[in-house]
Amino acid sequence: SGDYRLEADRSCSAFEPLRCDVFVTESTFALPIYGWQPQREVIDEMLRWWTENADASRASVLFCYALGKAQRILAGFADAAGASLPGAIVCHGAVESMNHAYRASGVALPDTFAVGDVERAALRRALVLAPPSAARSPWLRRFGTASDAFASGWMQVRGTRRRRAIDR
């Protein structure tokens, strides 16, 4: 194992220890230098960031891993804001294919859209979920001036934040 979900949400159960003879793990983020806010506080902070950007007609580009992290964020927004989100949620194709798999397995996620399905003016209020590999790609240019963030435990590391040159 490698990832330990400390809090359950609609996208995934929390880690459950099981009795076994041998357990092999890699757990970088278990080191004492990492401290984690409760999931709801992180989602509320993301929602405030998105709302501030939407109010300024600026897209919010949130880089996150296409499998797992993106769906955790979507589930968190649905639970925190329900139907009162500040704009459309636009997903990169890599994220959207994973959303389809989650929905097919019965996980309820908020509505998400391909970039071509959202009016150009509405893109300035959108939350854009994209994998880190999409950074500085032609795909992102269509959102114009945007605020960007990266949802990853690696952002707890000061050097990573500096190297990525991301707003948050």
Could you say what each language-model-derived stretch is?
Residues 1-68, 79-82:
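His/Asp/Glu-rich metal-coordinating catalytic cores
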Residues 2, 87, 145-147:
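Structural beta-strand/beta-sheet cores of well-ordered domains, especially the beta-sheet scaffolds
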Residues 16-18, 76-84, 106-107, 143-146, ...:
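Short, solvent-exposed amphipathic alpha-helical segments in soluble enzyme
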Residues 82, 114-168:
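C-terminal regulatory/interaction regions
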